Amino acid sequence: MKAYLVGLYTLTPTHPGSGTELGVVDQPIQRERHTGFPVIWGQSLKGVLRSYLKLVEKVDEEKINKIFGPPTEKAHEQAGLISVGDAKILFFPVRSLKGVYAYVTSPLVLNRFKRDLELAGVKNFQTEIPELTDTAIASEEITVDNKVILEEFAILIQKDDKGILESVVKAIEQAFGNEMAEKIKGRIAIIPDDVFRDLVELSTEIVARIRINAETGTVETGGLWYEEYIPSDTLFYSLILVTPRAKDNDMALIKEVLGKINGKYLQIGGNETVGKGFVKVTLKEVTNNGGTHAK
């Protein structure tokens, strides 16, 4: 199956909104129902890519419609040539007692990443990630007295006898490039799934927003609300799968157009005018031998 691997690295706090709720946070972020992990839904990402290619890269609308499908009102006429998957979380930044912050992940997250790579035909991430219950595997640069201390969690370190951290860094380099691998190297903490879940639920950014009445200078009735943001320095990944219907000339068109997003900066989610939602994108084409290479 022809596929492209997309990396999304948040440069500013990002709000892929899920609508309003009656809870403490009025405008929460998108989350997977079964895990509670932050996610950027495929339809949201598809819209961002489509808009960027049309408005910034000035790609011909006929080409965009062929690749992404026609606008909603004409969706019945034909299907697009690609399927844009949900952007799943891979690394989440958390305050660390040593090293300022760490990139945390978990066995569940890494094994899902491995599974998704295999779906796209990439089989060069073969390391088995062990189940962790009360210990972590972490870079030496962020450990203190044989522990990694993340927010209020102090987790004992187990020896990395199988070179798991090195394998993870290598996989990140192959998937997202050397720049990303160097960024996370020395800051990785593979922690128990339950602790990871708690951190991605409790360590997002909650921001109070206020709407002021211009005439009175006071807060309008109902003008105070709370928004949730994914923090800067979070890494997501997504797969773009090409339909088997695509012919050779279609493949060339897809490669030409999608290649324009590699290394570029996109805006995802709400509050663009206050600097939110800027991400850096990487794009890797899955090769026939199961590896990846940059576009």
Swiss-Prot record:
InterPro entries: CRISPR-assoc_RAMP_Cmr4 (IPR013410), RAMP_III_fam (IPR005537). Keywords: Antiviral defense, Cytoplasm, Endonuclease, Hydrolase, Nuclease, RNA-binding. The keyword Cell division does not apply. Changing residue 227 to A: Significant decrease in cleavage of target RNA in the whole Cmr complex. GO terms for cellular component: cytoplasm. It is found in: Cytoplasm. Changing residue 229 to A: Moderate decrease in cleavage of target RNA in the whole Cmr complex. Forms oligomers in isolation. Part of the type III-B Cmr ribonucleoprotein (RNP) complex, an elongated RNP with Cmr2 and Cmr3 as the base, with Cmr4 and Cmr5 forming a helical core along the mature crRNA (39 or 45 nt in length), while the complex is capped by Cmr6 and Cmr1. The 5' end of the crRNA is bound to Cmr2 and Cmr3, while Cmr6 and a Cmr1 subunit (Cmr1-1 or Cmr1-2) cap the 3' end of the crRNA. This is CRISPR system Cmr endoribonuclease Cmr4.
